[in-house]
Amino acid sequence: MKQLFLIIGAPGSGKTTDASIIANDNANITHYSTGDLLRAEVASGSELGKTIDSFISKGNLVPLEVVVNTIITALKNAPTNTILIDGYPRSVEQMLEFDKVLKNQSEVNLKGVIEVKVSEEVARERVLGRARGADDNEEVFNNRMKVYLEPLNEITNFYAKENIHHIINGERSIEAIVADMKNLINELLK
């Protein structure tokens, strides 16, 4: 049985960095981002990959069901039994579809949804300070923040009702955040 942790957080919360460090430090943990999974599926040349490519190549959004199937396929084929996925779900629709698919199978168990919590001010400082790409400007940041915040309460309430929502304070050093996240994951795997 694969044990899954979803890592969510605002743009600039450090969720991707935290998950990467944890997976790099532990050979028994695999870390994926949704975008990487879709690109890998396309690269594999599978039927699912061809379907995904038909949307991406035209600049269209990949349909919800296809994204969820891609994630589930990757989880089942993951090289380890413990998996971290960051930045998912991004919408209530994604969450509900993912939940439905997870409940209809027995190979993957959602152990926890870990929210790396930072204030909007800290997120803004980090994103606009890192200048990682063309999308790291104030206007784009504000839009990404809005897209993140709009469904957040509904997403966290849904997982809180399932007793799997956990919050980690993301406004500390990477070392402190990673240590807390590692401890939480280890506790939940017991």
Swiss-Prot record:
This is Adenylate kinase. NCBIfam families: PRK00279.2-2. Disulfide bonds: none annotated. The gene is adk. Its main location: cytoplasm. Pathway: Purine metabolism; AMP biosynthesis via salvage pathway; AMP from ADP: step 1/1. It holds the Pfam family ADK. Keywords: ATP-binding, Cytoplasm, Kinase, Nucleotide biosynthesis, Nucleotide-binding, Transferase. Its EC number is 2.7.4.3. PROSITE patterns: ADENYLATE_KINASE. Gene3D superfamilies: P-loop containing nucleotide triphosphate hydrolases. It is found in: Cytoplasm. Belongs to the adenylate kinase family. It comes from Campylobacter lari (strain RM2100 / D67 / ATCC BAA-1060). Catalyzes the reversible transfer of the terminal phosphate group between ATP and AMP. Plays an important role in cellular energy homeostasis and in adenine nucleotide metabolism. ATP binds at residues 12-17, 130, 172. AMP binds at residues 34, 39, 60-62, 87-90, 94, 132, 144.
